[in-house]
């Protein structure tokens, strides 16, 4: 089998599997906010919450306008993101997809329970992760021509509008390349990647309203309703929640109040 054929098969498998397992119900409050953003994008009304994830919402909105099905819209983006995660994982590890190692890597990422859940969930995590991997590949392994690096900086700007909290994943190579010559060109590429989503948000929300939403959500997340030591100082509970998130959510293992199927 040729490499390009293997990638086509992988892409088809990612899309079909995620579409078949798409969900048409709201799992949690964050999913509700992203679902409501398809009807009316309004950060001030927490549709979704700040920072708004405009790049992700934009592409999901396009899918929703075409298929008129919320579950399918999010799963299409999830399927594409799953393929991108596998693709750039293979690139970063310099692994051929048609090799035994490549097939194994593709298999464990494709069937990873957390990855599968996130590909169907109404959240931007997987899309943000796929962009972060693309940026890391360009910054670390790709030929470091100015044109290639400019693409990496542009994608970094898009990453800020997809999943801002994932920017630290690429921060070290980002800074290293930024200070090594052609500063203005690289910074301009990053700024373009940011402005392409920031200008529409400011026009839609209003600058003052956006700043107020940012202030309320940032302070609230770290001092009121977020999962920090300030909002929950019981370290035993925090440790148990950590174990649950890794074992049950990440590895798909059994936990109280979860389906008995997870025991298998």
What are these model-predicted stretches?
Residues 51-54, 58, 66-84, 118-122, ...:
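Loop-to-helix entry region of an early transmembrane alpha helix in multi-pass inner-membrane enzymes
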Residues 168-195:
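Perimembrane helix-loop-helix junctions
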Residues 2-29, 40-41, 160, 192-211:
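Transmembrane signal-anchor helices characteristic of membrane glycosylation enzymes that use polyprenol
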Residues 76-96, 133-138:
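Transmembrane-helix motifs of polytopic, lipid-linked glycan transferases
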Residues 11-14, 102-113, 137, 156-160:
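Short helix- or helix-capping micro-motifs
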Residues 4-8, 89-112, 129-130:
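Transmembrane-helix signature of polytopic, membrane-embedded enzymes
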